[in-house]
Amino acid sequence: MNLNNLDGYEDSNRTLNNSLNYPTQKALSPSLKNMNYQDFLSITEREQPEALASGNTAINTVVSVTGATLSALGVPGASFITNFYLKIAGLLWPENGKIWDEFMTEVEALIDQKIEEYVRNKAIAELDGLGSALDKYQKALADWLGKQDDPEAILSVATEFRIIDSLFEFSMPSFKVTGYEIPLLTVYAQAANLHLALLRDSTLYGDKWGFTQNNIEENYNRQKKRISEYSDHCTKWYNSGLSRLNGSTYEQWINYNRFRREMILMALDLVAVFPFHDPRRYSMETSTQLTREVYTDPVSLSISNPDIGPSFSQMENTAIRTPHLVDYLDELYIYTSKYKAFSHEIQPDLFYWSAHKVSFKKSEQSNLYTTGIYGKTSGYISSGAYSFHGNDIYRTLAAPSVVVYPYTQNYGVEQVEFYGVKGHVHYRGDNKYDLTYDSIDQLPPDGEPIHEKYTHRLCHATAIFKSTPDYDNATIPIFSWTHRSAEYYNRIYPNKITKIPAVKMYKLDDPSTVVKGPGFTGGDLVKRGSTGYIGDIKATVNSPLSQKYRVRVRYATNVSGQFNVYINDKITLQTKFQNTVETIGEGKDLTYGSFGYIEYSTTIQFPDEHPKITLHLSDLSNNSSFYVDSIEFIPVDVNYAEKEKLEKAQKAVNTLFTEGRNALQKDVTDYKVDQVSILVDCISGDLYPNEKRELQNLVKYAKRLSYSRNLLLDPTFDSINSSEENGWYGSNGIVIGNGDFVFKGNYLIFSGTNDTQYPTYLYQKIDESKLKEYTRYKLKGFIESSQDLEAYVIRYDAKHRTLDVSDNLLPDILPENTCGEPNRCAAQQYLDENPSPECSSMQDGILSDSHSFSLNIDTGSINHNENLGIWVLFKISTLEGYAKFGNLEVIEDGPVIGEALARVKRQETKWRNKLAQLTTETQAIYTRAKQALDNLFANAQDSHLKRDVTFAEIAAARKIVQSIREAYMSWLSVVPGVNHPIFTELSGRVQRAFQLYDVRNVVRNGRFLNGLSDWIVTSDVKVQEENGNNVLVLNNWDAQVLQNVKLYQDRGYILHVTARKIGIGEGYITITDEEGHTDQLRFTACEEIDASNAFISGYITKELEFFPDTEKVHIEIGETEGIFLVESIELFLMEELC
């Protein structure tokens, strides 16, 4: 059962059933009758555990070497380095000792494999040579540090460095002889640690020793390669050894766990600090924490019959916790039970530790978390809490005991003394048995006194409970320990690089998890869940709040995205990251090369002494794994940030120009020029006045070059819809902004539209005279955020992109200066790395999350008479759409060649063929339309309609005119197309015909252009649009439409009605005067439609002559049933000359 997944619980009262059940098996046992106490002792002595690591020189030595290495991480200073070599040499090559041989012997015993004599002898010989060379190098280094200008001292130290470096390169293969990699692993790790430390000196001092820069770089690159090589070798063979010891029995697990514990101490703890020998990445003293957990042997005498004891898998699954955040023991609540002795004459009853539960805290947190119960509480006789409350327990002394029965033996722990730096805590079930089990034997200190030099602290206790009816019973506690360096506080120092492991978080955002580490990281890893948030770390800042820090994150992933750091829930750092590997597996399978670093270019200051640091991911390229190893804080001096700004600005300005600074680089955008100018503006004029002035002049020159190459008129949007300049033309819904966090100059703000026929738009045509033949041009710009923004560049056809860009450049709360203006210098960190078009995603023609955009357009031949030009258009056609963008430019990209040249020639030919076809088609339509329009009018001046012209005929002429294509551009209906002059001419005549038609009609609103205005109607009558005309709709037989009109008495009138009946029944229009004279037109669905009226989709025009006897006439529209649609009612004088 998993006892460890308790991070989400403040307390848990559930009992964890650790009981291990085995088949009943009786065994022969000596009779206990008449046995005295001495006879009993002779039996129990045989039950004592085998000799542990008490006084083990190998273990004692490696913990001291690890301690010395941890104290000299990074670049701690020259005196530290020489003292480090002195201490290491004294530990690994003592005058009277064979430490290297003991390293081999220790591992040989653990894996039961002897090293062949020749392999051992060769390795020892190589190590002796390295020891001698180290002694000479250390003395030469110390001598040179005392007189660094002395040529002899320089020559001596350089020579000795080359000798010992060569010896290491030559000797390392002797420490990994095929077949003996595991028993030689401690030797390999110790030698690798020394070699990497030595290579650091080349980078630090090589220039002073006369090394060439190439030689220094070669040594540095070799060091980086060796860090990776040495790390992977050690973890590979550690895992191989562990796998070799995998077994099935309790005793096999004991040995398996000892190998794991001792090889962590003798190899992996050192491997975890290999990267800190890199003097460029860790350029000052460095503080780190080893968060791995080790388990001392079970607190028990040897089980008399281990074959039926707890199994290997039961021990591993129950005694060993699953990966978890680092926690700190606060309290043990222990239950005491009793084993009754078979005979008090032989031995006393055993009051023993039968169960417990653990209360613990996370790093820098006051909340207590309590596990369920380990062991068995049934029948307990007492219980109590044993509190530690920040008291580091560095040692335990225990009294494991056994009660002997004729056929069983019951194991238990009577006492445990917990030694803490703030005092001792004593669990005592009774005091009849001696404290014989000492954790120091397995986890020795780094010297005396132990309470000051201890290396590990107790962090947790698990237990195995075994019960069988007729054989051995046991409750066995197992203690787990963390390294002393993994302290409760995450201290951030003013003068040291601080590396905080990710498992020092106090909270993970569900479903982020802790996973087993690969071995070389010094602990486990945090793996992101499906959400962006990873978790929170609490830190203690041991420096003035004015201190600034750079931040670095070590990670492994096969995805790209953005890594965000929040401080006190305020986003403080953002930067893009790339994948470190192409494919990724589980955390335990990662290699050294799987990891990379996210480094932030801007510095931070902490707002208080106990900040909360939150790690967060966004914009991930896919949903694959992301592992966090650690976050690092690197202190910088007071002017560091200003110097960084200057260097960054100088580099940025230089990248704007081609060689000779006569032109801008092709990939430099107008937006980039603006952003570089902001970088220059942010340089301190007090510290770097001359440099700032020079850079300002250069960036102004760059801006002039940007303007001069831009083919767009009015790039700053000062004269939209100007009659004086043939530049931008736009609709309503556009606002011109000026100067914010993202844009230095003017920018555009587009809002959505309620009507797709009338979008929010802005366009400009680049004149043919500005273009070159067979040349590629690029439209470029920058978008802060947008939705449904469509961008077009058009020549022979349209290049079109829909641009949806997230509003993710800046935090929710933007920095301002004392005047309330945008603090661009503070905001610049968020704009440093925005996605390029190449990093964006394209789906269904929509370019997503690319703040920079670019569209190509190619020219063919140039014809100034045709003046085809290049059209540039931006529009939004949806209500939800919006956009904020600027820095628009169209620039020459270069000649069109190769396949692109063939393609543009084909496009031009295709366009010309299409244009010729369109011209022929348009001429035919024009002839038909002109003839239809001529037939409407009574004279050439189009001043009167012919008497018999109906609405349907005018509509028919209009339909012919509307069939003319390319009257307006397809991409924006307000922009005239190639047929616009012809269309305008004919449309004017159509409009004139409708006007004359309406003028002669005495029926008000007879075409229902104004809806139901002027008509008296029932509530169920409506007007709807159909085929460009308004149509009156009657759906019910009781619907009624009325209008009274005034006519000339005794004059003749003609009534024209264009209508359509659907379904059974009939529709009718009745005209009646006051004396009751009535005429009526009827429409049914089965009437034959005149082919000449087919253009209005089934509508029929009917007419009648009416001679009123009174001035007032009543017109009624109705139906008997079904649906009746009326398109037009016209009543005009017979004698009217129309």
Curated annotation (Swiss-Prot):
CDD domains: delta_endotoxin_C. The keyword Transmembrane does not apply. One of its GO terms (molecular function) is signaling receptor binding. Keywords: Sporulation, Toxin, Virulence. GO terms for biological process: sporulation resulting in formation of a cellular spore; symbiont-mediated killing of host cell. InterPro entries: Cry1Ac-like_dom-VII, Cry_V, Galactose-bd-like_sf, Pest_crys, Pest_crys_dom-III, Pest_crys_dom_I, Pest_crys_N_sf, Pest_cryst_cen_dom_sf. Pfam families: Cry1Ac_D5 (PF17997), Cry1Ac_dom-VII (PF21463), Endotoxin_C (PF03944), Endotoxin_M (PF00555), Endotoxin_N (PF03945). Promotes colloidosmotic lysis by binding to the midgut epithelial cells of Coleoptera. This protein is not toxic in its natural form. It is highly toxic to Colorado potato beetle larvae after an in vitro solubilization and trypsin activation step. Toxic segment of the protein is located in the N-terminus. Belongs to the delta endotoxin family. This is Pesticidal crystal protein Cry7Aa. It comes from Bacillus thuringiensis.
